[in-house]
């Protein structure tokens, strides 16, 4: 199935994703926020989108080597996701959920609906915007939350 465009009229308390490839994680997180889910647990998989966009003169040595660029892209993608969930009112943690020896894809995004001040939410969005500008990236979740026509 495809999470992009999936709709439900049922109440959603928790959204769980495991290795939703590339932007599928973004659509799952976006839908979780639209559904006003109380809890989100997401283990992203590959982050190809940002790897194809990222560039930085300041970080040129990191952009030169494919494996370093790939890992930086993955970390940048998940950091943006975490901050955007904060922006949308979720207390968010990014944690290692299994040891690296078992899986290199071991970051869990854990988000719980919370009462986060408008000031903190706007700060999270501004930090994401600055990071995206610096790295020349426009991740799908950022576009969905800032250019979407739905009020969340």
Model-derived segments and spans:
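Class I S-adenosyl-L-methionine
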Residues: 1-152
């Amino acid at each position: 199935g495809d999470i992009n465009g999936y709709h439900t009229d049922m109440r959603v308390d928790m959204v769980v994703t495991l290795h939703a490839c590339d932007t599928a994680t973004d659509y799952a997180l976006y839908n979780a926020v639209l559904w006003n889910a109380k809890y989100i647990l997401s283990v992203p998989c590959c982050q190809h989108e940002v790897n194809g966009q990222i560039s930085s003169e300041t970080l040129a040595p990191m952009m030169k080597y494919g494996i370093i660029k790939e890992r930086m892209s993955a970390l940048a993608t998940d950091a943006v996701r975490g901050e955007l969930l904060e922006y949308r009112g979720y207390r968010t943690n990014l944690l290692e959920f299994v040891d690296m020896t078992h899986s290199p894809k071991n970051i869990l995004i854990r988000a719980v609906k919370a009462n986060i001040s408008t000031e903190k939410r706007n700060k999270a969005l501004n930090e994401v915007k600055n990071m995206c500008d610096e790295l020349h990236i426009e991740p799908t979740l950022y576009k969905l939350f800032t250019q979407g026509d739905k009020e969340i």
